[in-house]
């Protein structure tokens, strides 16, 4: 049999924040300088907290200190792929990954101007004009970065929805620049909910151009205060605010009005989705709120049908139990993500993760989820895929194993890591990425090693 087509639909890219200056409109440079001063102070405090952290809720800072510390030379060289194309392609080759879909970054202090991580900023910036300008600066750089990859990287533009007609123009620009989707911030109080008609021009242009709309995991809202439990609660609810989008789109009739619109969940887990869709389906068929009319009387597309026709999800840091739930979603709607270069993803042990998570899935369905669905969904060049698969694709049988799948074990330590949510791969993968090479050696056949 032929080698596997391995495409990650969850990668991250972004310049070190200061280097965005050349991509930012000049009129915003003064505000940008102020932001850089604030971020420098934030980083200093963040790294100090990481050095001092014990087995406390600050354990997350301790891990992230190792990831972000300029003195950690080996890690810093590997994560340079967030903005260094040569390093990135080398890491992809080592994993046998032929293509990636790229979202904004922020873990390595490389957030885009005024935007933080997916539009949520550690230094509160409420000015819509600044946040949108920063997103456009990132999109300009991302288009250049992807264009230089020879078709291996597909970029997703960050779109801020404050001015809907500016957002429409930004989508058209992104498409013309070669980007292949958009990502929106989670719903918040600064703009209407996504089911409101004001967003119809945005959905229309995305459907017209085939630009998939994404909701990606990111920072939770800044509503948790300064209590010792605040960070744990924030991470515990990380995906909650993203889940609201699906209900808004489905019950708001967005997929009825825009039947060609495509929507993708990325890095918010998939194990919760089947039950959530079942709940939406129940509400659709019943007068759940005792209002005298069930939604099916005024909405022609059921949630299950909308999911099958319009939606997909990426399994990032996938676990065995999570992929079992993919059966209920439909294997044609599930894709895989490595999350390079983030510490909580599968990189640099993607083969081990896939072998475990997809252990009981038939090989045809496994091939769909780890690459073939993504190749079709994001319109990768078939000839490019064929040539790269022949060169670096994981050999047939690589992900077939007789070993019993390992379920992640949660513990108090995992809570203090700050990465507890509905999918348990995060705690395992953070240890993979941050432990010493002696503990978790690089076993990738394609990896280049020092002689």
Question: How does the language model describe each region?
Answer:
Residues 213, 217-220, 251-253, 259-308:
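Aromatic-lined glycan-binding groove of carbohydrate-active enzymes
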């Amino acid at each position: 049999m032929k080698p596997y087509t391995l495409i990650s639909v969850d990668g991250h890219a972004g310049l070190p924040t200061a280097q965005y200056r050349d991509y930012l409109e000049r009129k915003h440079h003064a505000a940008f300088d102020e932001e850089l001063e604030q971020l420098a102070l934030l980083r200093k405090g963040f790294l100090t907290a990481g050095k001092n952290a014990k087995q406390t809720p600050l354990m997350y800072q301790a891990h992230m200190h190792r990831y972000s510390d300029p003195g950690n030379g080996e890690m810093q060289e590997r994560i340079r792929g967030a903005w260094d194309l040569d390093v990135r392609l080398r890491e992809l080759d080592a994993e046998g990954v032929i293509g990636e879909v790229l979202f904004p970054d922020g873990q390595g202090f490389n957030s885009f101007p005024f935007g933080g991580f997916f539009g949520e900023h550690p230094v509160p910036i409420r000015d819509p004009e600044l946040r949108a300008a920063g997103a456009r600066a990132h999109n300009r750089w991302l288009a250049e970065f992807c264009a230089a990859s020879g078709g291996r990287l597909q970029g997703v533009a960050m779109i801020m929805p404050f001015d809907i007609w500016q957002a429409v123009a930004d989508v058209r620009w992104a498409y013309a620049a070669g980007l292949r989707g958009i990502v929106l911030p989670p719903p918040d109080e600064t703009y209407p909910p996504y089911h409101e008609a004001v967003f119809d021009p945005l959905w229309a242009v995305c459907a017209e151009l085939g630009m998939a709309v994404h909701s990606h995991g990111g920072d939770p809202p800044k509503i948790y205060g300064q209590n010792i439990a605040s960070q744990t609660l924030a991470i515990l609810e990380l995906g909650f605010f993203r889940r609201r989008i699906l209900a808004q789109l489905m019950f708001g009739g967005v997929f009825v009005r825009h039947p060609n619109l495509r929507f993708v969940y990325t890095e918010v887990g998939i194990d919760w989705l089947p039950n959530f869709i079942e709940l939406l389906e129940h509400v659709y068929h019943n007068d759940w709120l005792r209002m005298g009319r069930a939604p099916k009387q005024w909405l022609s597309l059921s949630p299950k049908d909308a999911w099958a026709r319009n939606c997909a999800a990426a399994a990032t840091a996938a676990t065995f139990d999570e992929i079992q739930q993919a059966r209920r979603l439909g294997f044609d709607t599930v894709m895989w993500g490595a999350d390079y270069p983030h510490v909580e993803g599968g990189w640099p042990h993607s083969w081990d993760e896939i072998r475990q998570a997809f252990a009981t899935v038939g090989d045809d369905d496994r091939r769909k989820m780890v690459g073939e669905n993504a190749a079709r969904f994001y319109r990768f060049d078939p000839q490019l895929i064929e040539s790269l698969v022949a060169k670096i694709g994981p050999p047939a049988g690589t992900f077939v194993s007789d070993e019993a799948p390992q379920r992640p074990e949660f513990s108090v330590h995992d809570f203090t890591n700050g990465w507890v949510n509905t999918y348990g791969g995060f705690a395992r993968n953070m240890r993979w990425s941050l432990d010493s090479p002696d503990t978790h050696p690089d076993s990738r056949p394609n990896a280049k090693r020092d002689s």
